[in-house]
Design a protein with these regions (language model features):
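Catalytic machinery of carbohydrate-active enzymes
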Residues: 1-148
Length: 148
């Protein structure tokens, strides 16, 4: 099994996502887990064992291989079974869909429902809530044991 985890784009958010990523690793110990991330985040996960390797997404970067359509083509070649989309962006869902990921799990925000196979209902934006709770919900949806 191949799993793609689309990582949050900010260092602090990625750190908060590591517990949910650990739950995915524990639930799927034999899976190859690929982290999709901005290049500057690779060192944050280095040595953690949470991912087996990374692919970079840098839409404004100088390397054309890290842009959306090139990344989608690369994902298609990977034949990924499961994608967890931590970022709530339309772009992330579009890349996962165009990349041919079989099962795409994320929150139904910003018209991205059509690109997800498992579109979870988000909590209201009117009420503040910890983003880590959303990361746990994604992990729980794919069968992971979560805190709480």
């Amino acid at each position: 099994m191949k799993i793609a985890i689309f990582c949050p784009n900010w260092v602090g958010d990625l750190v908060m996502a590591t517990a949910a990523m650990r739950a995915v690793r524990d639930r799927y110990p034999r899976a190859e887990i690929i982290g999709i991330m901005r290049p500057y985040l690779a060192e944050v996960l280095e040595g953690t064992g949470l991912i087996d390797r990374e692919l970079y997404h840098d839409p404004r970067g100088t390397n054309p291989a890290h842009r959306g359509w090139a990344l989608s083509r690369q994902l298609r070649l990977e034949k990924i079974n499961l994608g967890l989309l931590f970022p709530n962006s339309f772009r992330t869902a579009l890349i996962a869909w165009a990349g041919g990921i079989e099962r795409r799990v994320g929150f139904a925000r910003d018209a991205r429902r059509w690109f997800l196979t498992d579109a979870l209902k988000p909590k209201s934006r009117k009420t503040p809530h910890p983003v880590i709770d959303e990361y746990w919900r994604l992990a729980a949806h794919v069968g992971c044991r979560t805190a709480g």
